[in-house]
Structures are given as structure tokens and as C-alpha cells.
Amino acid sequence: MVDITPADGIPPAEVAEMELYHPHSWWTKYVFSQDAKVIAIQYSATATGIGLVALVLSWLMRLQLGFPGTFDFITPEAYYQFITMHGMIMVIYLLTALFLGGFGNYLIPLMVGARDMVFPYVNMLSYWIYLLAVLVLVSSFFAPGGPTGAGWTLYPPQAIMSGTPGGQDWGIILMLSSLILFIIGFTMGGLNYVVTVLQGRTRGMTLMRLPLTVWGIFTATVMALLAFPALFVACVMMLFDRALGTSFFMPAISEMGEQLQHGGGSPILFQHLFWFFGHPEVYIVALPAFGIVSDLISTHARKNIFGYRMMVWAIVGIGALSFVVWAHHMYVSGMHPYFGFFFATTTLIIAIPTAIKVYNWVLTLWRGDIHLTIPMLFALAFIVTFVNGGLTGLFLGNVVVDVPLSDTMFVVAHFHMVMGVAPILVVFGAIYHWYPKVTGRMLNETLGRFHFWATFLGAYLIFFPMHYLGLMGVPRRYNELTDMTVMTESAHHLNSFISIMAFIVGFAQIVFLFNLIWSIRHGREAGGNPWRATTLEWQTPQTPPAHGNFGKDLPIVYRWAYDYSVPGAKEDFIPQNVPGSFGPSKEPA
């Protein structure tokens, strides 16, 4: 750690602030750190660890579905518990934490030209509350009866009733408590991201000079700050129903002929609260992915992003529209047909700004000097996958088509393509792209290409056949389907094939983790800007960046984030902090 003093040219106020927030002991530097970069690594490591738990749970589910009756320890109750924990971990504790807590913490201060987040101490607390939420969630595996088996959507009354897989006394209480903690921690971090983007930008960094990665993370954070309160309220009310006997979501109901001590609640109210959060959550994950892909494509195609302002407004438009489509998840809940028509219409409208982004990505690639690096391969794979998943979403957004497909494997396939495979491809692409900045070394190229092809092709061999199973009427949420009147013999064989592919893709991730760890010491030295990128994170005086990011002087921004192939320039890129004019400006007006 380099000691920083006023003699180095940094204003005394900034030195005092940095010393206050970042003491030099090992314990406070690497464990209770207030450096956003260290916190980002902590978020990413924790999310990866809990993500591996979700991967193992998916393997257990696929064992049961692919080879029913073979593994006696996978009981129906255990199967539903696996579904619940796998879904909740992947959506909330892995993807949200990775994109916002991981990439958001590392990239926002560097990309906007700040020394750190505006509130470093609050940022540190947000991570430790997230870690506590993860530990509370994992503890439910060791609670009496195990974790809740209510499904990752936690629908009442099953989630509340005692004696059901969903209503395990401690399982559901720990799940709800964990979600409440997660939302508290995220709110602390999210406010930090928003304030840093709005108030922490360096001189010359206007909003329309921000990289699209920052726009994606910023918009997703604002959405989360608006959507998570609905889930928070739903969790608190359900916790009261389960622990205190209230009736927010429990209707008058009889269990085995005995009237339960609840009455007057509405399970549909919970669905509205959950999906008011749940559908924006799709784009809370997707919008950072959109921004990252835009930066990857522009950098590795050596071409300015096409339609920057359109891309920004498309991100904002998607974020706004995502709050008026939630009830398309509830077509089979008894909704009035007129409401179904309204939500089907808004669902189709949201495809317009999404299509703008796809067309602009394609036009950015058009006649570009495309370098098929590993980050670029993952970015291209994301575009293909998201388009495929979006096309099936057009089917499910239509009431007439959704009703017969709602409880089939078609929905599972669509959801995993859009919410699982596509974002994970971006996560991998981003790691391969920014790993040199974080560690100063490159990941192994051969292992990286093997990882890409095994993941990309394997994911399609898992989820494409699943669409076919859904069209055959194979239901989801069943732990065992052996009756040939429900599933044909060919469908059973297909299920077994999907399970085998799930294991192959899972083991490919072990190769990736090995590459990640091995390259820290043995990877090729990357230099300061191996991709010859224009954005500020690549212009730091040290790699990896020291605390304070930019040494004694913060950068001054003179241009937008995508000056590639500029006539008259010495190289095919001009960093944002380089002054001067080279030919006609391509910066958006």
C-alpha cells in the first residue's frame, strides 16, 4: 500500500478522507475494507460460493428428473426444497449481487473518475449485511425440517401452512428473514451507486459521456430501489402470517377437515406484491448485462457504439416499462380478461426498446474490425441467446398461448434462457474482459475458449429440448413423471439427455474456476490496457488500481466513451482523458 500525503499533490481534504476511510492495517484493508474494489471482490466471491450451492442443487434435481426412482434420498419434499433454494439463490443472491454488488462496486467509481464510492463506510456495511443474509439462508439447510419447499416464488397458502413442504416452521422463517436482510443491505449499497453516478463524476464526465455499463447499472439500481420495497413488505407480512397468526395472505381454509385459525387474507395480494418486484428483477439483472455487452462489442469490434443516445433511452425506457407488465405472470390466477389484454399489450411494447438495442449491437458490428476474443465470443453468444429467449417470451406474453403453456417445461426453458443463460454469459464475458484490470494478468486463452464452447453449446443442448418437452405438455414442478400417459418414452429419453448435459456444463465451470485461480499467479502479464479500450478504468496509473484509483490527480474527461477508429489519431482508439481533436467528432450531440 502506497502512503498518500498532501506532498503528493492530492488536496489535504481528500487525503484526510481517504485515510479516515481506509486505515492501513491488513485487517481493515482486506476484510473490513471500505475500498469499493475490495468490496466488489468480496461480493463476487460470496455470490460465486452460494452460486455453486445452487449448481449442486440443480444437479440433484436433474438426477431425479432424468433418472426417476433411482435416488431414494431425493424425496418429493427434498425435491421441492431444492427447487426453492436453487431459484432464490440464482435470481437474488447470485445474479443481483454479482451485477450490482460486484461489477457495480468495481466499475462505477473507476468509470466515472471517482476515488471511491461517495459513502465508503455504508458500502462496507452493505456487503456484511449481504453476507449475513446468505448465512441465514444457508442455515435453513440445517434447521429442523430443512429449508422451505414453497417454490422460489413463495406462494401462499403453501408457504405459510404448517406441515407442508413450503411451511416448514424454521425453513420459511429463515428464508423470509434472509430476504429482508438482503433488501436492507442492497438499499444501503444501491443508494451509494446512485449518488456516486450523480454526484461523484469527475470533471468533464457528463451524463452523456458515461459508458453504457454505468447507465445499465445505474438504471437497474434505481429500479431495484423502487421494486424491492414491494418484496420487503410482502416478506414482513408473510412472516407475521407464519409467526404471529395474522391473515394478510391466508384465506379462510380447512386442512384435513379442520378450520385453520386464519381468515380474510388474499393469496393473490402476495402474487401482486411479489411480481411487482419480480418482473423488474428480470431487468435489474438484464440492464447491467445490456450495458456490459455494449462496451464489450464496441471495444472488441474497434468501432463506436451505434446510436449511443438511443441506447441510453432504450435502457431507461425498458426500466420504466418493466413496472407495468408484472401481471403477465398471473394470467392463470383468475384475472379479468380486460386486464389480461392490458398486460399482454404492455408486454409486447417492451419488446420495442429491447429490439432497438439488438439492432444497434448488430449495426455496431457491421463493418467493424471484429476481434473474436473470449469476451467478444461471450457477448455475441449473449445476443443470440437473449433474442432466442425473447422470442419465446412473445409467445408467453400472449394470454391465449400462455394459459396452456403456463405450467409446462416451456416456461422453465424460456425463463432459464432469458434469466439464467443469457446473464451468466455476460458475467463470464465481463470477467474475461476486466480480469486483467483486477489482477494485472490475463486468463489462459485455451482454457477460456474451451470454457466458452462447453458452456454455450451445452446450455443450448439443455434448454432447447426443454421447449419441446413443454410443447408436448410435460408439466413442471413434478418430482417424478413415470406414467406414460403423461410423458412418452421419447420424452423420458430427452429428460435423461438433458440431465447428462447439465452435468457436463457444470463440470466445465470447474475448468473456469481453475483458470480464474491459476492465472492470478501464472497468467501472462496484461499491462495497463490490454484491450486498447477508451474508458477511464483502463487509464489508471497502476494495475490493479491502488486505493484512490487515479493517483494524485483525478482525470479530466474530454470526449465520450467510444472514440474508436478516429481519423488522424495515432492509434485506433482515443481514451476519454486525452484532449485534442482528431477529425470530425463522433460524440453524440
Which residues make up each language-model segment?
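Membrane-embedded and interfacial regions of multi-pass energy-transducing membrane proteins
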Residues: 2-589
